[in-house]
Amino acid sequence: VEAGASISSMPSSEIYTGMQTGVLDAANTSSASFVSYRLFEQAKCLTAPGENALWFMYEPVLVSKRVFDGLTEEQQKAILAAGEKAEVYFNEEVRKGDQVMIDTYKKAGVEVVEMSKEDYDAWLELAKASSYKNFAANVPGGDKLIEKALAVK
């Protein structure tokens, strides 16, 4: 609220109606969902992913420590090597999906912009003074989680 907005959480499948009815003024979801749910029909502007993006979709493959520790060293190495190979592939595919989204929105007449470094820095300062501060105060270990999130490059 201090930043002039409030958060509303809903499934991506409901964002279209939320924007259509005025419940939402903006939304954040995956590039694929922005296209598949035809959100370009409700949006006037899209902030495209780029160097100064505010978020990224992190979709790891998870294995419990108990299971991983139960594997042989050779199996562990194979899984880690496959993960590294998959990371390269998925990063390339994500960029392709981002471009499909950008092209789709431009074709629909939506203004597509990228956040500048100056805009990002201003946003970050506002976030630190409002939502980050609130998160750190109300979530156990929240300050450490924010530090870890900001360390991701």
Functional labels for PLM-detected ranges:
Residues 1-153:
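N-terminal secretory/targeting leader peptides
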